[in-house]
Amino acid sequence: MHEGVQVSSKLEQLQALLAPVVEGLGYQCWGIEYVSQGKHSVLRIYIDKEGGILVDDCEAVSRQASAILDVEDPISSEYTLEVSSPGMDRPLFTLEQFASHAGEQVKIKLRSPFEGRRNFQGLLRGVEEQDVVVQVDNQEFLLPIDSIDKANIIPSFD
């Protein structure tokens, strides 16, 4: 449990540091992931804008983010910085993002089991207060947003 708190506060610190940089360049900061992988970690910044994201957009954000990260130095270990668009299988981070993608198929992984399971794949019904509502087969689950480790849209190619 304690590790999750550290990761969460690290994410909050990175979000507070990097979101203004991204938004100052004219992009939406869709979300930030910090994945600790032993000695080497990955910091991912997802950016978006009307009309989509190009490689040049990612490079511009990467340059500015690198500069602020070098000065502020919030990550003491080695890490790789990745900047990308959310893509078709976009990750979902906020209640607003979950609400705006209601009606789509999602894959959700929880930090710890809920009703005996950690993985849910089904129809995103929306949000209720601080819960994400997902329908798996004919059963609805209300998953607290704070318990979600990772959530992605499952692209439809119909």
From Swiss-Prot:
GO BP of this protein: ribosomal small subunit assembly; translation
SUPFAM superfamilies from the UniProt entry: YhbC-like, C-terminal domain, YhbC-like, N-terminal domain
Presence of the UniProt keyword Metal-binding in the record: no
Alphabetic keyword roster: Cytoplasm, Ribosome biogenesis
Cellular localisation: Cytoplasm
Organism superkingdom: Bacteria
Major subcellular site: cytoplasm
A Pfam short name: DUF150_C
GO cellular component, one term: cytosol
Family matches, as PANTHER family: RIBOSOME MATURATION FACTOR RIMP
Similarity comment: Belongs to the RimP family.
Free-text function comment from the UniProt entry: Required for maturation of 30S ribosomal subunits.
Entry protein name: Ribosome maturation factor RimP
